[in-house]
């Protein structure tokens, strides 16, 4: 990379130390390179001029050409006067509005001079208005040369200091004019085959495209490059791991697995479960460590697949463990596994933080001798005193709850690293899985066991609570249980969110004949355990909770999930909460309660929830609505996102294309030392040193 790109931004004419400090703090811009990579978030075509007579209030940004007729200053009773400029283009009159800077505006934009005005038209008292429009002297500017105007994101602090998108645009334009030609950062054969523009052309066109076509060409080139280096790094890392870590060869299927399959399997495996078991078997016979991500919606049978995987380890003379993020989840996994294995001579034990004294000592001793074959627990399994005789398989449930360093400790529990099976009930779209879990092989259970009744999801408004309470009462009288979820534990001053404490009291009055439990994030673990245990044992009929119940709780008798203020939740959260019901044979319901003031995006979320139970469809929609950074678990996944221009949700085809090209490079140069690829490996080193966080995954 040219050394000029490493130049401190303070040396760009017009910036200096003070502006540099603000740009660094607010936008992370410290160098010329940072400014070049601060890409526009949108563009507006400035080559067209509208007449005022053509306008309507539904138009987005438009451009006018005309003269200021006069100014009016209006006293609003506040410190700054409102400034109104009456603007005419010969086809009509519009008002230009400024809430501050009146003296500067009147001095800069003079009556009778012709200007280009650019902004969003609104209507007030039958007249079009433009608030804080962009203004350019029409005599000094050729409209035909303006093309697509870039718009840059700003923080509130920058706006308060008087910065606008145009401020960033001017700095970028100044930098681009002094830049020498930028060197290529992709191999010529990739650039030619994919018909990409050069890096130099892309960087210049992304900030100043003359047309929509130029903008698209620049975006495709820069997005592809960004995704290509992410994929190249992931695939190289995965290849290194496979070469470095041998795996136990488990090619024996014997009495334990066969006995379970023949006599203890509760139902015929679904086609998806059989397919996943074949994939796992192939991994365990390959001689390399298995690193597999098992995705499956709630109730798809992941735990059964995980158990059968552990039984293969037992058949080959090894132990297995399963880790869950909470004690409640660990206890439920233990119960499920013991139910499956009832009547089989297999010792299963639980190890969590609450197992103390002689019982703990006994478990640790029997683990070291191999007497315990399957250990279920929390992160307590990772503690130093926990030593396995021969750990062959480790199953990790809800993987994002375990940090990279924690998972690495598993490898010290055994001579060779154990086979790793990561389970998640949070469906991960394919493009996202390729990026954040790129070094894990992915298996998907996309089929529910037969006989499961799909959950019915209904949308109700908060004015319909009386009839909703009657429906809840009917369900409880049929012997069912109900979850009622509130979004927050305490009301904030700026929000009208229901307070769980007040809501709990209201519900007690509404249902005096029933018993209620209550759990929220501010309670101590022991208190939550007691309240949850009462609900699990059917001692209480209604559980009032915040989202702390969204992962792992298994109460087959609960058939109704009511989510209050559902407009406050993301799609992924709503789907996870819905997954707490529908675990028994009864028809289950999820009721989404909202107010009437719903944004278009919220309506889309509610409609998707009512339309489908398919977690993968919901995850794809969530990714498109919110972007990858908000998806639960991605920030803890181990591959932190630092994408400047690519969008995993919308650029799925480019993700796949980048992965294919990166895979071909690694296939042809597995040692990463071929002279023709020197450019790639040097560029990757540069990226690792600068702004991209390449943490390992599993």
Where are the language model's segments positioned?
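Long, highly charged, low-complexity intrinsically disordered interaction regions
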Residues: 1-13, 25, 230, 240
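OB-fold nucleic-acid-binding modules
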Residues: 38-68
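Upstream accessory/linker segments immediately N-terminal to the RecA-like ATPase cores of bacterial MutS
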Residues: 74-264, 668
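Inter-lobe coupling/hinge segments of SF2-like helicase ATPases
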Residues: 275-278, 289-608, 671
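Accessory helical-bundle/CTD segments and flexible terminal tails appended to RecA-like ATPase motors
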Residues: 513, 532-542, 549-556, 561-564, ...
